[in-house]
Amino acid sequence: MAYERYEPVIGLEVHVQLQTNAKIFSPDAAAFGAAPNTQVDPISLGHPGTLPVLNETVVKHALRLGVATHCSIADRSAFARKHYFYPDLPKGYQISQYDTPICYDGYLEVFPGEEEDASPSAPDSRRVGLTRIHMEEDAGKSVHASAGGTTRLDNNRCGVPLLEMVTEPDLRSPREASLFLQRLRQLVRYLGISDGNMEEGSLRCDANVSVRPQGREAFGTRTELKNMNSMRHVEQALDYEIARQIAAEERGESITQQTLLWDADAGTTRPMRSKEEAHDYRYLPDPDLVEVRIEDATVDEVRANLPELPRARRRRFVEEVGLPAYDAGVLTEERAVADYFEEALRHLYKRTKGGDTDAQAKAVSNFIMTEVMRVLNERDLSVSELGVGPERLAQLVFLRLQDKVSSNGAQEVFEAMLDAPDKSAGRIADERDLIQVTDRGAIAPVVEDVLNDNPDKVNTYLGGKDGLLGFFIGQVMQRFDGSPNPELVRSLLREKLDARRDTANVDE
């Protein structure tokens, strides 16, 4: 959506649910999908006399995300109680961080100008400032019945560890907001701290949005959008709210600061409540939790052990491996796929022992982006569940590079490899008679026989009917006990037919 007279101003509050074996302050399991109220204990339910104990893994995950997003790390960080009353908050308060977050003043870049359908006005990159990243516990879940007006509580989520990331109001379009979330999801997956699945609630986003006339510095009155559980819903909700605010401004109406719920079915928002300020939550220091102290050596260790991050890996795939930028972007979208590609390429290099490494990398990339990803999507698998490891994929790509199997033959071999984990690509190709004959000396006599057996068609071809070349290729293929390389057959036929044409011209 284009905005001619107004500029949207968007900031995000994103909750990242962490992958840990236990909750943030108790030893309960924190797995998704368990039966309601089966992952609770007195600590997460806030029973009297219980004391929380901070899960060290949560701190490590927070540091990994903070360092990866260029944040400053607080050497001292404390927890606070955020008070509000809601049925799915058993304690009557949420343990969070208020004025001393563990990470602050960072940034994450998005690249709107690299989108295939980017508008000419889209910036190549936008640095989105991060105000803070802090640790907190999740609340429970209210399940509202569609009939009867009853609400049931599932407290499994109480105490599940979260990182809340608050951005600066640096985003200028719904698309940029969606790109930011995609980049963040990719990052937390690379870091191994969250699966980033919005549909399961592992990545949740609220948006603060306002509009202002183009060129004005002061911000307009903002509203907060909630209940956006997919990237598509984020864009749709922001598009709707921006259009609503612009229409109100055009009518001379004031914008009310409030919280709005996105209704995806209706494609509209509805008011939830007036927007709270910090004082509404009565933040108080938590007396049961000691201060978190982070030493410089700890931060240095985290920085040294970070994996290669997506943007750097993509750049290396282009500059050092020799892939096109598009391929590099697709392969680095998920860390597991990028790892699979690199391992397969390493095994291929062992087999080729040199040659055109750019072409070899492209061959592996092509097969992953077509056949491998097709199977992953069709069977809803992760690459680790594929059944064809990187070494076996390298066997198949090597056969293809040597022209031992055709393109269609390689697809057939790959399908068979999925169900035959103990068989090599070469063995499957041999068992299915898919190995191509590539010996010119073996193919040339058959080509000569076909031409000698069809003199009338040869004369017709020489007279200008080039379409008969396909007939000759088919005849050669039929006479082989096996599968000759069709491109080699085509090349030999043209050589011999051209030779006969030259001879005929000389005789004339």
From Swiss-Prot:
Matching SMART domains: GatB_Yqey (SM00845)
Keywords: ATP-binding, Ligase, Nucleotide-binding, Protein biosynthesis
Annotated catalysed reactions: L-glutamyl-tRNA(Gln) + L-glutamine + ATP + H2O = L-glutaminyl-tRNA(Gln) + L-glutamate + ADP + phosphate + H(+); L-aspartyl-tRNA(Asn) + L-glutamine + ATP + H2O = L-asparaginyl-tRNA(Asn) + L-glutamate + ADP + phosphate + 2 H(+)
Recorded GO MF terms: asparaginyl-tRNA synthase (glutamine-hydrolyzing) activity; ATP binding; glutaminyl-tRNA synthase (glutamine-hydrolyzing) activity
One GO term of the biological process aspect: translation
Catalytic EC class: ligase
E.C. designation(s): 6.3.5.-
Coiled coil feature spans: none
InterPro entries for the chain: Asn/Gln-tRNA_amidoTrfase_suB/E (IPR017959), Asn/Gln-tRNA_Trfase_suB/E_cat (IPR006075), Asn/Gln_amidotransferase (IPR018027), Asn/Gln_tRNA_amidoTrase-B-like (IPR003789), GatB (IPR004413), GatB_C_1 (IPR042114), GatB_Yqey_C_2 (IPR023168), Gln_synth/guanido_kin_cat_dom (IPR014746)
PANTHER family hit by this protein: GLUTAMYL-TRNA GLN AMIDOTRANSFERASE SUBUNIT B MITOCHONDRIAL AND PROKARYOTIC PET112-RELATED (PTHR11659), GLUTAMYL-TRNA(GLN) AMIDOTRANSFERASE SUBUNIT B, MITOCHONDRIAL (PTHR11659:SF0)
Record's function text: Allows the formation of correctly charged Asn-tRNA(Asn) or Gln-tRNA(Gln) through the transamidation of misacylated Asp-tRNA(Asn) or Glu-tRNA(Gln) in organisms which lack either or both of asparaginyl-tRNA or glutaminyl-tRNA synthetases. The reaction takes place in the presence of glutamine and ATP through an activated phospho-Asp-tRNA(Asn) or phospho-Glu-tRNA(Gln).
Subunit details: Heterotrimer of A, B and C subunits.
NCBIfam families named in the record: gatB, PRK05477.1-2, PRK05477.1-4
Family: Belongs to the GatB/GatE family. GatB subfamily.
Protein name: Aspartyl/glutamyl-tRNA(Asn/Gln) amidotransferase subunit B
Source organism: Salinibacter ruber (strain DSM 13855 / M31)
